């Protein structure tokens, strides 16, 4: 089950060592340990661009993880992978699932807004002005909420909103 760390990043190695120690000393259930190990392996694979392996690990982690907050990050990362693979609709599904479990996950709100903004841009290119307005309005709503939750983040979104008088 443990994944070998190919990454030479000091912070990643330190995290792995600390996580392994914590898993051994903290009073956690076997399922919690399995969930965390799969999640950590998923993050490692994802950081190395091994998306299929990362997805397998995240799906396994979801089988064992019961905490909604922790599940939200697993679902969010699955959404990131689908987005990276150009599967925007599938990414949206996972971002929404992440938000259902953790409504304060501003990163998911930002990514949803980004997808809607992209769809708005595509509609403009195809001379679908009314459809583009719908997507841009959705993007604005999600960015506003992301900014409300994380006021020091999302500078480009703030600028876009101010230009559009939103």
Curated annotation (Swiss-Prot):
It is a peripheral membrane protein. TPR repeats lie at residues 35-68, 72-105, 120-153. GO terms for cellular component: chloroplast thylakoid membrane. Pfam families: TPR_1. Keywords: Chloroplast, Membrane, Photosynthesis, Plastid, Repeat, Thylakoid, TPR repeat. InterPro entries: PSI_Ycf3_assembly (IPR022818), TPR-like_helical_dom_sf (IPR011990), TPR_rpt (IPR019734), Ycf3/AcsC/BcsC/TPR_MFPF (IPR051685). It is found in: Plastid, Chloroplast thylakoid membrane. GO terms for biological process: photosynthesis. Gene3D superfamilies: Tetratricopeptide repeat domain. Belongs to the Ycf3 family. Essential for the assembly of the photosystem I (PSI) complex. May act as a chaperone-like factor to guide the assembly of the PSI subunits. This is Photosystem I assembly protein Ycf3. The lineage of its organism: Eukaryota, Sar, Rhizaria, Cercozoa, Chlorarachniophyceae. The gene is ycf3.
């Amino acid at each position: 089950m443990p994944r070998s760390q190919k990454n030479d990043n000091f912070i990643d190695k330190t995290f792995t060592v600390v996580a392994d120690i914590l898993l051994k000393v903290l009073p956690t259930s076997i399922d919690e340990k399995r969930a965390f190990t799969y999640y950590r392996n998923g993050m490692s694979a994802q950081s190395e661009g091994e998306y299929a392996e990362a997805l397998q690990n995240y799906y396994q982690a979801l089988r064992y993880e019961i905490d909604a907050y922790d599940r939200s990050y697993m679902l969010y990362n699955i959404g990131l992978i689908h987005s990276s693979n150009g599967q925007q609709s599938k990414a949206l599904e996972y971002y929404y699932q992440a938000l259902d479990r953790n409504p304060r996950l501003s990163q998911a709100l930002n990514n949803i807004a980004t997808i809607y903004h992209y769809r708005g841009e595509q509609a403009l290119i195809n001379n679908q002005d009314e459809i583009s307005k719908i997507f841009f309005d959705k993007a604005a709503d999600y960015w506003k909420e992301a900014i409300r939750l994380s006021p020091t983040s999302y500078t480009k979104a703030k600028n876009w909103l101010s230009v559009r008088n939103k």
